[in-house]
Amino acid sequence: MTTNDIRSIIEQEADAVRHIPISDRYAEAVDLIVKHVHEQGGTLITGGMGKAGQIAMNMATTFSSTGTPAFFLHPGEAQHGDLGIIRPSDLLLLVSNSGKTLELLELVQLARGLVGQIPIILITSDPQSELAREATVCLPTGAPREVCTLGLTPTTSTTVMTVIGDVLVVGTMERIGFTTADYAKRHHGGYLGSKSR
């Protein structure tokens, strides 16, 4: 691998981030999060499978550490009892590159069967997909080509998903007036904990 190879990979990923579609849907997503979590006392529940699931898990921990209670619900485990954690005041933040992930489609139906019409924020490459049709707010990734030499391994897609999640986190922090003191209460240990105090 040469420095040109490395530069090319980085540039392709950076270009994908620059081409994430920007719309008022982001503000709508933040409004939903603030309404259901900070005004109605609900929880932001994230979900995804495979690499997208890892991104969803990271989103949950980042939201939680910045003042928005959240947790990751594994779609498979949801079918074996974990679904019971969902309450009527909660909302779902789902991550699926294809927008067709069977386990997430099933999770949506199961959640609705339990608590009714639960709001759904979806991050996907396909705004016309089955999951997108079920979503309250759909945030498209721009469907970037994977930088992987096979064009298959989730690489560029997970990068843009992460960035979209960061936009939602920061937007929510701004809306709720999250401060350094608030951060310190939730992040006592490590370098960031000491830096925030």
Region spans (language model):
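Glycine-rich phosphate-binding loops that contact phosphosugars or nucleotide phosphates
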Residues: V34, T43-I176
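Internal, active-site/partner-interface "lid" segment
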Residues: R133, V147, E174-R197
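Residue-level signal for alpha-helical context at structural boundaries
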Residues: D31, G81, R186-H187
